[in-house]
Amino acid sequence: MTLLILLRHGQSVWNQKNLFTGWVDIPLSQQGIQEAIAAGESIKHLPIDCIFTSTLVRSLMTALLAMTNHSSQKVPYIVHEERPDMSRIHSQKEMEQMIPLFQSSALNERMYGELQGKNKQEVAAQFGEEQVKLWRRSYRIAPPQGESLFDTGQRTLPYFQERIFPLLQQGKNIFISAHGNSLRSLIMDLEKLSEEQVLSLELPTGQPIVYEWTGQKFTKHAPSLG
């Protein structure tokens, strides 16, 4: 059984304040920290061989906190791929107690452009709720100077296919800690959702989604798998 575990980061400080966040690098709130720890509890008995996060701190914090009580007792270590010598471990004994963690901006949240840092209710009052709904929930319409969900998938999916999927094919169990829209674009592909179907896909913060790669397809497991 080869597993793919997806987790939207815990609540961030700007989620709490109802602000558009996007690529602004905001940490988890106190609630988000607790959500990440609770998510870790629900997956602590699932095998994990590699971890992938975005380059944003809320994604990294979530992954690290979720792994603090993993039954393997293995420690995540960040692989600096631009300088592999920085994270090279010269002890085989220690290597066996570690899980590599890779970061990529391809997994970053959708970039919200000129909306970043603005209050969602205030933006709705300024531009109208229908316009904001189009920016937030349509598939191809982007906010000013930002990305649509389609645009997000244009970077997320190639990275998954080139970097992550080959590891699944090798039988590696993968844990991805990322963001609402980068994960929505990925789930759209995994579950073969239409452009209309993905619009109703909601991913709560801090709640893992588990798939099994059968060698032929991805099968979604019930939340109780962990």
Swiss-Prot record:
The active site is at 9 (tele-phosphohistidine intermediate), 109 (proton donor/acceptor). The keyword Isomerase applies. Its EC number is 5.4.2.11. It catalyses: (2R)-2-phosphoglycerate = (2R)-3-phosphoglycerate. SMART domains: PGAM (SM00855). SUPFAM superfamilies: Phosphoglycerate mutase-like. This is 2,3-bisphosphoglycerate-dependent phosphoglycerate mutase. It comes from Chlamydia trachomatis serovar L2b (strain UCH-1/proctitis). The gene is gpmA.
